């Protein structure tokens, strides 16, 4: 932190659910860090709706700090959080900060059925890499969504990235 010229972290994200550590222990530690001025707010990434609600309920019941943000995978191509995570965030006034909102390049117009990833790029070197893998997303559903995004972008003379981010 000293090297960065910072005294505290604005928002500390816990990257997932730790099934080996009781949530009360994690929240107690994070609350201690907030009280010590090391971090200002806490948040979570990649947890389900029930896990997020357990975090919030435990924090409230025990007098610990409550998360201010949730960072799920969310974009036009992946809307799985809408059934549980999104309602939990709304109910508990938790901000949403999606990761990979452009789908690893998919929602930029970078990839298409005719334009496979090539060369020294993440997917060019390994088309099966990660959740945005070309071979996983290379589906009719993906191309139908991309066609609509592209049509909206063209109609408004904006890049596809603007449409995808505005949708959020």
Please annotate each region the language model reported.
Residues 2-22:
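Active-site groove signature of glycoside hydrolases
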